[in-house]
C-alpha cells in the first residue's frame, strides 16, 4: 500500500544517512557489520510499511540486527522516526528494490526473511512481481544461511495458495502452515507480532494466512 507523501519524512531520511541507506549501488555488496558496528545475526523484512513489526522485533531482540527493506521514502521516514525515538541501534533501513536483495546482501548472510502482507499482484501478467515468485525465491536462497528460513503472512487467500504452490515447486520445506493464524494455539498467537495492516484486518474477523518455510539441503 502506497503511503501519502510526507515532506517531513523525506527531510528526516536525508538527515540520517547513518541509519538509512538510500538506493545503494547493486553492483556492490553492503558491509553490514560496518553499518551495525558488530557481526550479530541479521534478519530482513521485505516491505516494512510503517514499521511496527520490524521495530518491535528490534526492540525485543537487542542481540540481533534487523534490516527494513522498503522502497517508499515516506515509509522509511516513519520507520526511522520510531527507530530514533526508541534508540534502536540494531535496526537499519534500506531504501531499495526487493528484486535486488541478493545484490545488497552477501550469500549466507541472513537468518530470516519476513514477507508480511506483500502486494498480491493478482493479474496473471504480473506474476513475476509477486515476492514469492520463483526468481525471488532463488534470490532469498542465496542470502539465507543454511539453516535460515522465510516467514510469510498475508490476508489474501489467492496469494497464499500461490505462494504455497510456488515454494513447493521450488522444493522448499514447510515448517509451519496456518489458514487462520490468530486462532492457532495460544503459544503461537502470543509470539505473533502484528503489522498495522494485520491488526486492522484481523479485527474485522478476517483470517490471516501464514507459513514458515526453508530451503532443504
From Swiss-Prot:
Gene Ontology MF, one: tRNA (guanine(46)-N7)-methyltransferase activity
Enzyme Commission number(s): 2.1.1.33
List of residues binding substrate: 123, 155, 195-198
Keyword tRNA processing among record annotations: yes
One Pfam family this sequence matches: Methyltransf_4
Region (Interaction with RNA): 125-130
Pathway: tRNA modification; N(7)-methylguanine-tRNA biosynthesis
InterPro entries documented for this protein: SAM-dependent_MTases_sf (IPR029063), tRNA_(Gua-N-7)_MeTrfase_Trmb (IPR003358), tRNA_methyltr_TrmB_bact (IPR055361)
Ligand binding (S-adenosyl-L-methionine): 45, 70, 97, 119
Catalytic residues as annotated in Swiss-Prot or TrEMBL: 119
UniProt similarity note: Belongs to the class I-like SAM-binding methyltransferase superfamily. TrmB family.
Function per UniProt: Catalyzes the formation of N(7)-methylguanine at position 46 (m7G46) in tRNA.
Protein's name according to its UniProt entry: tRNA (guanine-N(7)-)-methyltransferase
